[in-house]
Amino acid sequence: MTGNYHWKVFWTVAIALFAMVMDFSIVFLALSSIADEFDVTLRAVTWVAIASSLTMSAFMLPLGRVSDITGRKRFHIVGMMLFVVGALLAYSASNLQMLILARVVMSLGSAMGQAVVFAIIVGVFPGSERGKALGMITTTVAIGAAAGPIVAGPVIQEWGWRSIFLVTALPTIAGIVAAFVVLEDSKIGSETRSLDARFDWLGSILSAAALSLLILTISNPFAFEWISLQTIAGFLVSLVLLVALVRWELRTPEPMLNLRFFKNPTFSWSTSTRFLGFIGGSATFFLMPIFVQSFMGYGQRSAGMIMFVGALGMGLASQFSGRLSDKYGFRKFTFVGLGFLVMTNVWFSFFVKDSSLVIVMSVLFLNGLGMGLWMAPNMSATLSTVSRVDYGSMSAFLNLVRNVGSVIGQALTAAIIAGIMLSRGAEVQLDQLSESDNPAVTDAFLAGWSLTFRVLAIVTFIALLCAIQTRVFVSDRDDSN
C-alpha cells in the first residue's frame, strides 16, 4: 500500500469505532434516569444493556462472514447507517419497549461495524506494520470506553438521557461520509461474491441461538438461582447447540468459521489467551465505579475521571506494544502485560474502604497498562495464522471472544460478590450499595471483592500460561499487502 492511504482508512473507521465503543459504556450511566422517566424498575431497564449484548453476540460471527462475501465497504457503511437510525429511534422512544427495540437496531449496526473494522485495518496495513495498526485500534477502543463515563455525566445532567444517543450518532454520521469518500474495496482487501452460494445459514442460526442462550443464562437477568432448573437447562441447551454447531461447521464446505484454524497451535493458544485475559480483566471497569462511588464517596463525574486513568494506561501501552511487537515479536509484550494484570488483580484484592486515591489510581493505571500491553500483540499473533480472505470472519470472531469473555468475567464477579453477601445476610443489590450504612454490608461486599480479584488473578495467570505456549507462526503467504 503506497502513500498514506492506510492512515486515511484508519481514521475513517476509527471515528465510527470510537462512537460505537463509547455507546456501550455511556448507556450504563443513563439506566437510572431512564428507569425514572419510564417509571420502571432498575431490573427491567437493564434490558436496555442486555439487548445490546445479546444482539452483538448473536450476530457478530455471521456478519463477519457476510462481510467477507459481500465486500467490506458497503457492509461497513450499512452498519453505520443502522447505528445512526437506531440512535435516532432511541432518542425519540416513548416507552421502554421502543427503547429496547432501538437498542437492538443500534447494536446490529455496531456488530456490523466491529465485525469488519479489524479486517479493513489489517487489509490496508502491510504485514510488517500489523501490530502498529492493531495498537492504534486498541487505543481507539480504550479512548471510547473511557469517554463514555466522562461524557455521560455532564451530558445527562444538562440535556437529559436522550441526548447521549445524539452524542454517539454525530461522529458516526461523519464516519459514513468519510467511508463513502475514502474506502475502496479494491484496496481494503475485499471482493464481492454470491451470498446465496456461500453463506452458511444453518451455522449462523446455530451460532446465534447458542450464544444468545449462553449469554442470557450467564447474565441471568431473571435472577434465577444458579442451581436451579432454569439455569441448568439454559447451560445444557447451550452446550447441545454448540456441539451441533461444531459438528456442522466441520462438515460444511463453506463454514461460517473455519474451525480447522484451531489445529494451528498459534491460533488455538492465542485465542485461549484472549478469552481468559478478558475474563480476568473485565471486572475492573465493572466493579471500580461501584467502589469509587460507594466507598470513596466520589460522584459520578469524578468517578469517570478516576476510571479514565486506566483507559489512559491502556491507550499508551497499546501504542508502543503494537509498534514494537512488529519488530520484536508478540511474546514479550503478552507476557509482561498479563504479568501486570496478575499483579494488579492481586493488589485490587487488598483494597479496603479507606484506600487512598493515589494508590487506587496507580493500580488502575498499571492495570490499564497491562491490558494495553497484551491485547494488540495477541491479536496480531492470531491474525498472522489466517489469510486475507478470512479477515472479516476472523475479525468478528476475535470481537466475539472479547465480548463473551467480558460477559463471563462480569457474571463471575457478580456471582461471587452476591454469594458472599448473601451468605452473610447482607441482601443488598450492588446498585443500592451506596445507600446502605450497615457495616455488615460493607464488610460482606469487601470480602466478596477480595475473593473475586483473587479468583481473577488465578484466571489471568492461566492466561499467562497459555501465552507461554503461543509460538511465532511462520507462513509462506505474502502478507505485504
Would you name each region that the model predicts?
Residues 1-185, 317-322, 328, 332-342, ...:
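Transmembrane-helix bundle of Major Facilitator Superfamily
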Residues 64, 73, 128, 199-202, ...:
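Structural detector for helix-capping/boundary residues
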Residues 171-212, 263:
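Central mid-sequence intracellular linker of multi-pass
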